[in-house]
Regions:
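Bacterial N-terminal signal peptides
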Residues: 27-37
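Core dinuclear metal-dependent hydrolase active-site scaffold
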Residues: 47-52, 68, 73-75, 80-84, ...
Length: 298
């Protein structure tokens, strides 16, 4: 029979390599955690502002929330969003300003989008980037107000509305041909960045997501902030009611896909409070007021 001393010695011999492996594993794990933490901290954090530049009074809620009472009306907010940080001033959507929209729509409380930035001390030429969530007139018409900005749009959105959409009268509702021509011209000038699909970080700390299906390839935006990720849903979620009642927007090409996008927004955002709908006037009361018509998303 082996002596206890010999057994202990053998156990020690076998244990040493195991302990060495364990220590190596712990070192690698700790390093990975530190790298991940450093990466998260190195992403720039932006200030995010919602800017109300106009109102559409008495808008039918049934055109915003699927299945809503047709008699319900709401004075909806027309908004753009400013992301400020990392040496950039980034707009999400550009609003509208051309005269013919005022005869086609009942617009009140209008401020030209380029002027609506003034309370934040931002001039039109200070805008470095404009992210167009989709090509509808009230989101894309003002892109040429910002002469030094790079315009970002989903590649499929540009290709569809510059081509196939016009082969039928039923596939370009809400799209103004002049806005399409402006976008094509800006592309020929080298000022358009094409976002190729879902989950694309186009600028450090700013990521575009697809799936809302408000238009052919509409996108929404996730923004890194000090409070965590803010989601700017734009028209992929018109009102808080869409999210709270888990109801798709009324104007979508795919209701199931729109609901999946809303569910995903909850996963992306640091908390549901930081999911910002596209036209809900309640945005202006849920967040701290910075100036008339301007709130800080936090």
């Amino acid at each position: 029979m082996e002596s206890p001393w010999v057994c202990e010695n053998l156990i020690s011999e076998y244990a040493r390599p195991c302990m060495s492996l364990i220590r190596s594993f712990l070192r690698v794990t700790a390093a990975a955690v530190l790298i991940a933490s450093a990466s998260a901290q190195s992403k720039p954090a932006y200030e995010v502002f919602a800017i109300r530049y106009a109102t559409l009074p008495d808008f039918p809620v049934a055109e915003l929330v699927a299945g809503a009472d047709p008699a319900r009306k709401l004075d909806i907010a027309m908004m753009i969003w400013l992301l400020r940080g990392n040496g950039r001033n980034i707009l999400v959507d550009s609003g509208f300003y051309r005269d013919h929209f005022f005869s086609e729509w009942k617009v009140s409380d209008f401020i030209k989008p380029s002027d609506a930035l003034q309370p934040l001390g931002v001039k039109p030429d200070d805008i470095t980037d404009v992210i167009i969530t989709h090509m509808h007139w009230d989101h894309a018409d003002g892109m040429d107000l910002f002469l030094k900005a790079r315009i970002w749009i989903q590649k499929d959105e540009l290709q569809y509305y510059a081509g196939e959409a016009w082969q039928s009268k039923d596939t370009h509702g809400g799209i103004d041909p002049d806005d399409v021509l402006t976008l094509v011209r800006l592309n020929t000038e080298g000022r358009v960045g094409l976002v190729d699909g879902d989950g694309q970080e186009i600028i450090p700390g700013v990521t575009c997501y697809t799936g809302g299906r408000h238009t052919y390839a509409s996108q929404y935006v996730g923004v890194n902030t000090a409070a965590g990720t803010v989601v700017l849903a734009s028209d992929n979620m018109y009102l808080y009611e869409n999210l709270e009642k888990h109801v798709p927007i009324a104007a979508t090409l795919d209701a199931a896909s729109n609901l999946r996008a809303q569910d995903r927004m909850k996963q992306i955002a640091a908390n549901p409070k930081l999911i910002v709908p596209g036209h809900d006037p309640a945005v202006m009361t849920k967040f701290p007021l910075v100036a008339p018509g301007v709130v800080r998303i936090q």
